[in-house]
Swiss-Prot record:
Residue ranges, compositional bias (Gly residues): 7-18
InterPro entries linked: DUF4605 (IPR027953), FAM241_domain (IPR052502)
Major location category of this protein: membrane
A Pfam family hit: DUF4605
Record's protein name: Uncharacterized protein FAM241A
Record field: compositional bias (Low complexity): 30-43
Region feature (Disordered): 1-73
Gene behind this protein: FAM241A
Length: 138
């Protein structure tokens, strides 16, 4: 049997020429590999490819803007109220339904705190103001 070097070299015999040819081929292969690495790293746009980080960022952006409704609707209220509302719902508070209007637990707690600090007359005034604003927007 013959080795892979002998098959590639085309010769089966001895001498130092077979070994030298293998070393030359190895050096050429290393230079070629180094050249392709430099080309691919130097200008990825020239070959029609973009770096991996940019491709991942584009994928994330396309997934965020798919046009589908967002499952977590607490983003509408802002981060602080949304997170508080999510925590209250997880603790067992429920949403209150007044006809077509849905009142989130964080709003109910907010009005209870206002009642505690401001008293009944101020609470009634603010509640009336909120109801007027809701019906004027419709």
């Amino acid at each position: 049997m013959c080795s892979a070097g002998q098959l590639l070299g085309g010769g089966g015999g001895g001498g130092g020429s077979g070994g030298e040819r293998d070393e030359d081929r190895d050096a050429l292969a290393e230079r070629a590999a180094a050249g392709t690495e430099q080309e691919s790293g130097a200008s990825p746009r020239r070959r029609g490819r973009r770096p991996l980080e940019e491709r991942e960022q584009d994928i994330e952006e396309s997934q965020n803007h798919t046009g589908e409704p967002v499952g977590d609707d607490y983003k509408k209220m802002g981060t602080l109220f949304g997170e508080l509302n999510k925590s209250l719902l997880n603790m067992g508070f429920t949403r209150m339904y007044f006809g077509e209007q849905i009142v989130e637990p964080v709003i109910v707690i907010f009005f209870w705190v206002m009642l505690w600090f401001l008293g009944l007359p101020a609470f009634g005034l603010v509640a009336l103001l909120c109801l007027v604003i809701i019906y004027v927007q419709q």
